[in-house]
C-alpha cells in the first residue's frame, strides 16, 4: 500500500513538473530561449505575462530601454532608471541579459552626430561621443549584461554600408571603433552585429565581409544576430539556412533575434526598416477580431518549420529570441502602418501558447543537430 502511494505521488510530481516545463526546458543544451521585454513587463504590471517570461525564457533583451535615444537624450545626461530595472529583473531570474543596442542610426538622440547648428560634427568629436556613450553604458553593466548588440543595421540590402551619419563622418571605421570601445571596458562581454533581411545573398556577403574584416584586424566579434522578422511568404527558408551556414563558417555564433511572423497581407515587401511606414489601409488589416483557421494553420506550420531549422543548426545557433511575449506586444501592430491587428508572436492576446508552441512543449518538435560548421 505504501509503495503504491509513493508511486502515485511520484507520478503526480512528474506530471506536474512536465506541465510546468517551458520552452527553455525543451531546448535545454541546444540554445537559449529569449524574449524582448517592455518597461511595464519588467515592472510586473502584468503578472500573468511575468509568469510566462519566467517559465519559458532564460534570456532577455529590452525592446527599447537601452537604445541611445532613451539612455542619453541629452549629451552627458544619462537616464538609467528603466535600464537598471531591466538588468535587475534579469539578474534576479538568472537570465542571460542582452544589451540592445549601442550604435544604431535610428532612435538616436538628435545631438549625437551634429553640432548646435545641425551640421555634422568632426570625426574626432563623433569618436569621443561614441566612446563616452559606449563605455558609460557598458561599464555600468559590466559583468551583468553578458552580450551586446554593438552595431545595429549598418549594412544595406545590396551589401554596401548604410549611409548613416556615422558612416558619413567616419566611414566603416565607426563599426570597428564601436566594437573596440565596448571590448575595452568589458573584455568578458560577448559582442554582436545585428541586422534584418539577412537571408538576402548580397546582404549575407556584406555581413560575412564585415565579420572577416574585424577578425583580420583582431577586433573582437562573437556573433551575428539574424533578425527574424518574417511573413507568411518571406523569407525563403532555404536562403535563411544559407545565411546561418555562411555566418557560422565565418567563425561567429549565430543568433535568431527579434523573431516574429506577421500573419497579415503585405504589398510593400519584407523591409524591417522602421522608417518605411505606410498610411493605414483597411485592406491590409483584415483580421481585426480573430485569425481565420486556414491562416492560423499556415502561420503555425511555418513557425514550426523555422523552429525545426533552428534545432537542426543548434550547433551554430546560440540563442533564439522572440520580439515580444504575446500578440498585443508586437511592434507589427503598428508597422508599417499604425492601428492594425497582427498575430505575430508565440502567445495569443489572451496569453495562450500558439499550437506550434504547444507541440514544442509536448516534445513533438525535434530535430537532430547537424555537425558544427568548421
Predicted segments — roles?
Residues 1-19:
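Bacterial Sec-dependent N-terminal signal peptides
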Residues 24-28, 47-58, 84-96, 138-142, ...:
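Acidic (Asp/Glu)-rich catalytic clusters
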Residues 36-47, 68-81, 155-160, 197-206, ...:
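Acidic-and-aromatic substrate-binding clefts and catalytic sites of carbohydrate-active enzymes
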Residues 17-59, 63:
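Boundary/entry segment of secreted carbohydrate-active catalytic domains
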Residues 20, 55, 59-73, 82-199, ...:
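Substrate-binding cleft and catalytic face of glycoside hydrolase catalytic domains
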Residues 19, 23, 119, 140, ...:
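Aromatic-rich peripheral "rim/lid" segments of glycoside hydrolase catalytic domains that contact
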Residues 40-56, 129-137, 203-214, 303-309:
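Short, acidic/polar
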Residues 34-39, 150, 178-203, 255-258, ...:
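Aromatic-lined carbohydrate-recognition surfaces of secreted/lumenal glycan-active proteins
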Amino acid at each position: 500500500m505504501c509503495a503504491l502511494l509513493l508511486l502515485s505521488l511520484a507520478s503526480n510530481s512528474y506530471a506536474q513538473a512536465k506541465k510546468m516545463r517551458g520552452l527553455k526546458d525543451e531546448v535545454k543544451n541546444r540554445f537559449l530561449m529569449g524574449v524582448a521585454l517592455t518597461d511595464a513587463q519588467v515592472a510586473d504590471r502584468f503578472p500573468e505575462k511575468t509568469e510566462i517570461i519566467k517559465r519559458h525564457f532564460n534570456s532577455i533583451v529590452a525592446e527599447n530601454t537601452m537604445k541611445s535615444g532613451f539612455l542619453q537624450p541629452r549629451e552627458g545626461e544619462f537616464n538609467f532608471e528603466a535600464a537598471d530595472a531591466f538588468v535587475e529583473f534579469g539578474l534576479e531570474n538568472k537570465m542571460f541579459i542582452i544589451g540592445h543596442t549601442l550604435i544604431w542610426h535610428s532612435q538616436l538622440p538628435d545631438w549625437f552626430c551634429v553640432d548646435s547648428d545641425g551640421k555634422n560634427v568632426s570625426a574626432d568629436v563623433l569618436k569621443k561621443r561614441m566612446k563616452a556613450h559606449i563605455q558609460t553604458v557598458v561599464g555600468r553593466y559590466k559583468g551583468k549584461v553578458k552580450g551586446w548588440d554593438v552595431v545595429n543595421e549598418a549594412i544595406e540590402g545590396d551589401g554596401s554600408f548604410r549611409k548613416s551619419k556615422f558612416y558619413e563622418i567616419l566611414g566603416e571605421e565607426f563599426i570597428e571603433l564601436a566594437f573596440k570601445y565596448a571590448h575595452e571596458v568589458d573584455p568578458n562581454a560577448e559582442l554582436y552585429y545585428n541586422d534584418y533581411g539577412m537571408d538576402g545573398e548580397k546582404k549575407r556577403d556584406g555581413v560575412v565581409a564585415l565579420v572577416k574584416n574585424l577578425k583580420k584586424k583582431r577586433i573582437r566579434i562573437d556573433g551575428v544576430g539574424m533578425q527574424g522578422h518574417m511573413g507568411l511568404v518571406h523569407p525563403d527558408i532555404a536562403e535563411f539556412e544559407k545565411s546561418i551556414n555562411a555566418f557560422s563558417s565565418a567563425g561567429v555564433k549565430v543568433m535568431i533575434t527579434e523573431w516574429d511572423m506577421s500573419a497579415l497581407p503585405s504589398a510593400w515587401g519584407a523591409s524591417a526598416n522602421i522608417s518605411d511606414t505606410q498610411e493605414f489601409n483597411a485592406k491590409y488589416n483584415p483580421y481585426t477580431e480573430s485569425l481565420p483557421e486556414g491562416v492560423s494553420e499556415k502561420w503555425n506550420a511555418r513557425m514550426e518549420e523555422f523552429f525545426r531549422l533552428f534545432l537542426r543548426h543548434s550547433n551554430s545557433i546560440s540563442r533564439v529570441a522572440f520580439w515580444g511575449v504575446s500578440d498585443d506586444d508586437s511592434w507589427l501592430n503598428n508597422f508599417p502602418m499604425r492601428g492594425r491587428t497582427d498575430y505575430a508572436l508565440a502567445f495569443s492576446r489572451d496569453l495562450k501558447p500558439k499550437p506550434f508552441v504547444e507541440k514544442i512543449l509536448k516534445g513533438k518538435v525535434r530535430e537532430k543537430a547537424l555537425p558544427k560548421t568548421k
